[in-house]
Amino acid sequence: MTDLVPLLQEFYRDKLTMMRRHAAAARVVAQYDANNTYQYIINREETQLSWIAKAIEELGGTVADGADGGRSLSGKGDGASRAAIEEDARDAQSFVDRWRPRVDAMTHARHAKMLRVILGEALEAKRFFEQALAGRTDLLGRRADVLEPASGEVLPTRWIE
């Protein structure tokens, strides 16, 4: 168990960094369906981080929230959006490639399964990114035939009076 807490803490930091990078990307990805997909992915990542944090705390460890996304996105429009999505697709695969061997070597079945679920969801996010790059708008499901195709853009920040 002595190796388990540091491993979970490192995984947590990597996942937190990934979530913060996705939040930064969501500010430049304006296409409605792609942005909704980012919101869905970020929500899942918040849930995953809560699972990992709970596991760390149950083992007597502490959770550090100091990870920085380290992402500065410049530009606007489709070019900036495409660059962010392409980078996130690559990062998702890199995350899985980096962590899968370590997770597969874990002997603690419950925590290994939890991390495998998270790795699977990272691959699902990668698939969403690839579909967005291909121009798909049915990322989170299909609309009824009676409705028009989605259109519109999302503002980079919330407008509150």
Regions found by a protein language model. Give the residues of each.
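Iron-associated oxidoreductase/ferritin-like identity signal
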Residues: 1-161
